Protein backbone atom coordinates (compact mmCIF):
# COMPACT_ATOMS: atom_id res chain seq x y z
CA UNK A 1 0.00 0.00 0.00
CA UNK A 2 2.80 2.46 0.77
CA UNK A 3 4.37 2.05 -2.66
CA UNK A 4 0.96 2.55 -4.29
CA UNK A 5 0.49 5.71 -2.24
CA UNK A 6 3.91 7.05 -3.19
CA UNK A 7 3.52 6.41 -6.93
CA UNK A 8 0.25 8.36 -6.93
CA UNK A 9 1.78 11.10 -4.80
CA UNK A 10 4.81 11.34 -7.09
CA UNK A 11 2.57 11.60 -10.13
CA UNK A 12 0.68 14.56 -8.68
CA UNK A 13 3.64 16.36 -7.10
CA UNK A 14 5.87 16.42 -10.19
CA UNK A 15 6.09 19.69 -12.07
CA UNK A 16 5.44 17.96 -15.40
CA UNK A 17 2.76 15.59 -16.65
CA UNK A 18 3.14 12.26 -18.41
CA UNK A 19 0.93 9.16 -18.46
CA UNK A 20 1.05 6.72 -15.55
CA UNK A 21 -0.17 3.17 -16.17
CA UNK A 22 -0.85 1.04 -13.07
CA UNK A 23 -1.87 -2.62 -13.01
CA UNK A 24 -3.32 -3.52 -9.63
CA UNK A 25 -5.32 -6.78 -9.34
CA UNK A 26 -8.11 -6.90 -6.80
CA UNK A 27 -6.93 -10.13 -5.19
CA UNK A 28 -4.00 -8.43 -3.45
CA UNK A 29 -6.40 -6.16 -1.57
CA UNK A 30 -7.47 -9.17 0.48
CA UNK A 31 -4.05 -10.66 1.14
CA UNK A 32 -2.97 -10.46 4.78
CA UNK A 33 0.65 -9.75 3.85
CA UNK A 34 -0.30 -6.79 1.68
CA UNK A 35 0.21 -4.19 4.40
CA UNK A 36 2.63 -1.37 5.16
CA UNK A 37 3.64 0.18 8.49
CA UNK A 38 2.81 3.83 9.01
CA UNK A 39 6.51 4.75 8.81
CA UNK A 40 6.54 3.68 5.15
CA UNK A 41 4.12 6.51 4.36
CA UNK A 42 6.00 9.31 6.17
CA UNK A 43 9.45 10.45 7.32
CA UNK A 44 10.98 10.93 3.89
CA UNK A 45 9.75 7.62 2.47
CA UNK A 46 9.35 7.39 -1.28
CA UNK A 47 8.37 5.13 -4.18
CA UNK A 48 10.62 2.08 -4.61
CA UNK A 49 11.19 0.88 -8.17
CA UNK A 50 12.61 -2.38 -6.85
CA UNK A 51 11.68 -4.08 -3.56
CA UNK A 52 13.57 -6.83 -1.76
CA UNK A 53 13.76 -7.98 1.84
CA UNK A 54 16.70 -7.22 4.10
CA UNK A 55 18.93 -10.21 4.81
CA UNK A 56 21.35 -10.83 7.63
CA UNK A 57 24.85 -12.07 6.77
CA UNK A 58 23.89 -15.62 7.73
CA UNK A 59 20.71 -15.50 5.63
CA UNK A 60 22.63 -14.12 2.65
CA UNK A 61 25.05 -17.06 2.74
CA UNK A 62 22.17 -19.51 2.30
CA UNK A 63 20.77 -17.89 -0.86
CA UNK A 64 21.49 -19.67 -4.15
CA UNK A 65 18.40 -18.72 -6.18
CA UNK A 66 17.00 -15.30 -7.07
CA UNK A 67 13.42 -15.00 -8.31
CA UNK A 68 12.53 -11.81 -10.15
CA UNK A 69 8.83 -11.08 -10.44
CA UNK A 70 6.31 -8.28 -10.71
CA UNK A 71 2.80 -8.07 -9.35
CA UNK A 72 0.65 -10.35 -7.26
CA UNK A 73 2.52 -13.59 -7.95
CA UNK A 74 5.00 -12.38 -5.34
CA UNK A 75 2.54 -13.19 -2.56
CA UNK A 76 2.03 -16.76 -3.79
CA UNK A 77 5.77 -17.29 -4.10
CA UNK A 78 6.46 -15.86 -0.65
CA UNK A 79 3.65 -17.89 0.94
CA UNK A 80 5.11 -21.07 -0.55
CA UNK A 81 8.63 -20.16 0.58
CA UNK A 82 7.38 -19.50 4.10
CA UNK A 83 5.34 -22.70 4.18
CA UNK A 84 8.33 -24.85 3.22
CA UNK A 85 10.78 -22.67 5.17
CA UNK A 86 13.06 -22.37 2.16
CA UNK A 87 16.22 -20.47 3.10
CA UNK A 88 17.91 -20.60 -0.29
CA UNK A 89 15.37 -18.57 -2.30
CA UNK A 90 15.28 -14.77 -2.42
CA UNK A 91 12.68 -12.65 -4.23
CA UNK A 92 13.32 -9.33 -5.94
CA UNK A 93 10.20 -7.46 -7.05
CA UNK A 94 10.10 -5.06 -9.98
CA UNK A 95 7.61 -2.38 -9.01
CA UNK A 96 8.33 -0.29 -12.11
CA UNK A 97 8.74 -1.80 -15.56
CA UNK A 98 9.20 1.40 -17.55
CA UNK A 99 11.41 3.32 -17.40
CA UNK A 100 13.29 0.15 -16.55
CA UNK A 101 15.05 0.41 -13.14
CA UNK A 102 18.58 -0.47 -14.30
CA UNK A 103 20.44 1.25 -11.45
CA UNK A 104 18.21 -0.02 -8.66
CA UNK A 105 18.47 -3.59 -9.96
CA UNK A 106 22.21 -3.32 -10.41
CA UNK A 107 22.67 -2.33 -6.78
CA UNK A 108 20.25 -4.98 -5.56
CA UNK A 109 21.80 -8.03 -7.23
CA UNK A 110 25.55 -7.36 -7.21
CA UNK A 111 26.16 -9.63 -4.24
CA UNK A 112 23.97 -12.38 -5.70
CA UNK A 113 25.86 -12.84 -8.97
CA UNK A 114 26.67 -16.46 -8.05
CA UNK A 115 22.98 -17.44 -7.78
CA UNK A 116 20.54 -19.12 -10.14
CA UNK A 117 18.40 -16.45 -11.83
CA UNK A 118 14.68 -16.92 -12.45
CA UNK A 119 12.01 -14.68 -13.94
CA UNK A 120 8.60 -15.89 -12.76
CA UNK A 121 5.20 -14.76 -14.02
CA UNK A 122 1.77 -16.34 -14.14
CA UNK A 123 0.97 -14.99 -17.61
CA UNK A 124 1.77 -16.89 -20.83
CA UNK A 125 5.27 -16.43 -22.22
CA UNK A 126 4.06 -14.10 -24.97
CA UNK A 127 2.18 -11.92 -22.46
CA UNK A 128 2.98 -10.33 -19.14
CA UNK A 129 6.30 -8.54 -18.63
CA UNK A 130 8.68 -11.20 -19.94
CA UNK A 131 9.12 -10.14 -23.56
CA UNK A 132 9.66 -6.54 -22.47
CA UNK A 133 12.08 -7.13 -19.61
CA UNK A 134 14.01 -10.17 -20.87
CA UNK A 135 16.87 -8.42 -22.67
CA UNK A 136 16.91 -5.53 -20.20
CA UNK A 137 17.23 -7.84 -17.22
CA UNK A 138 19.85 -9.94 -19.01
CA UNK A 139 21.91 -6.81 -19.63
CA UNK A 140 21.87 -6.02 -15.89
CA UNK A 141 22.91 -9.58 -15.05
CA UNK A 142 25.76 -9.29 -17.53
CA UNK A 143 26.94 -6.04 -15.93
CA UNK A 144 27.09 -7.59 -12.45
CA UNK A 145 28.91 -10.66 -13.75
CA UNK A 146 26.14 -13.18 -13.09
CA UNK A 147 27.42 -16.75 -13.28
CA UNK A 148 24.10 -18.23 -14.45
CA UNK A 149 21.74 -17.39 -17.29
CA UNK A 150 18.23 -16.08 -16.75
CA UNK A 151 15.46 -18.72 -16.86
CA UNK A 152 11.78 -18.14 -17.61
CA UNK A 153 9.01 -19.75 -15.58
CA UNK A 154 5.42 -19.07 -16.56
CA UNK A 155 2.65 -20.39 -18.78
CA UNK A 156 3.23 -21.56 -22.32
CA UNK A 157 2.64 -18.97 -25.06
CA UNK A 158 -1.06 -18.78 -25.86
CA UNK A 159 -3.61 -16.85 -27.88
CA UNK A 160 -5.77 -16.31 -24.81
CA UNK A 161 -4.67 -14.91 -21.42
CA UNK A 162 -6.92 -17.36 -19.54
CA UNK A 163 -7.51 -21.11 -19.71
CA UNK A 164 -11.26 -20.90 -19.24
CA UNK A 165 -11.14 -23.87 -16.84
CA UNK A 166 -10.52 -22.97 -13.20
CA UNK A 167 -9.07 -26.35 -12.15
CA UNK A 168 -6.63 -26.18 -15.04
CA UNK A 169 -5.65 -22.66 -14.02
CA UNK A 170 -4.98 -23.76 -10.43
CA UNK A 171 -2.93 -26.78 -11.52
CA UNK A 172 -0.74 -24.64 -13.76
CA UNK A 173 -0.38 -21.99 -11.07
CA UNK A 174 0.73 -24.58 -8.53
CA UNK A 175 3.28 -25.96 -10.97
CA UNK A 176 4.67 -22.49 -11.71
CA UNK A 177 5.18 -21.79 -8.00
CA UNK A 178 6.79 -25.20 -7.47
CA UNK A 179 9.16 -24.81 -10.40
CA UNK A 180 10.26 -21.35 -9.30
CA UNK A 181 10.96 -22.28 -5.70
CA UNK A 182 11.84 -25.99 -5.63
CA UNK A 183 12.79 -27.42 -9.03
CA UNK A 184 16.39 -27.81 -10.16
CA UNK A 185 17.66 -26.05 -13.28
CA UNK A 186 17.44 -29.20 -15.40
CA UNK A 187 13.70 -29.44 -14.80
CA UNK A 188 13.29 -25.70 -15.31
CA UNK A 189 15.15 -25.93 -18.61
CA UNK A 190 12.72 -28.60 -19.81
CA UNK A 191 9.88 -26.16 -19.14
CA UNK A 192 11.57 -23.17 -20.78
CA UNK A 193 8.79 -22.87 -23.36
CA UNK A 194 6.27 -22.46 -20.54
CA UNK A 195 4.03 -24.55 -18.30
CA UNK A 196 1.00 -26.37 -19.69
CA UNK A 197 -1.02 -29.45 -18.78
CA UNK A 198 -0.38 -31.42 -21.96
CA UNK A 199 1.89 -33.85 -20.10
CA UNK A 200 -0.94 -34.59 -17.69
CA UNK A 201 -3.16 -35.66 -20.63
CA UNK A 202 -5.31 -32.58 -20.33
CA UNK A 203 -6.01 -30.13 -23.15
CA UNK A 204 -3.33 -27.62 -24.05
CA UNK A 205 -4.38 -24.14 -23.04
Regions found by a protein language model. Give the residues of each.
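Peripheral docking tails and interdomain loops at the edges
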Residues: 1-2, 10-14, 20, 25-28, ...
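Active-site phosphate/pyrophosphate-binding segments
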Residues: 1-73
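A short acidic (Asp/Glu
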Residues: 4-9, 31-34, 77-80, 101-104, ...
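Secondary-structure transition/capping motifs at alpha-helix termini
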Residues: 13-17, 61, 80-89, 111-115, ...
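A short, gly/pro- and small-residue-rich
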Residues: 37-46, 84-90, 129-145
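Charge-patterned, long linear interaction tracts outside catalytic cores
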Residues: 63-65, 69-71, 77-78, 192-205
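Short glycine-rich or small-residue beta-strand-to-loop segments that form or flank ligand, phosphate
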Residues: 64-68, 116-123
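Generic long, charged, amphipathic alpha-helical segments
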Residues: 74-113
Amino acid sequence: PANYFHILRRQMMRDFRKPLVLMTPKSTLRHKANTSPLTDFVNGSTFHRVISNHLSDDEYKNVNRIIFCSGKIYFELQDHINELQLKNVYIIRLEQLYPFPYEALNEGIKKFNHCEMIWCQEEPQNMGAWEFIENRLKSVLHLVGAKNELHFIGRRAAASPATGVFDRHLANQKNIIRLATEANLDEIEKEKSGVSLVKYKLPIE
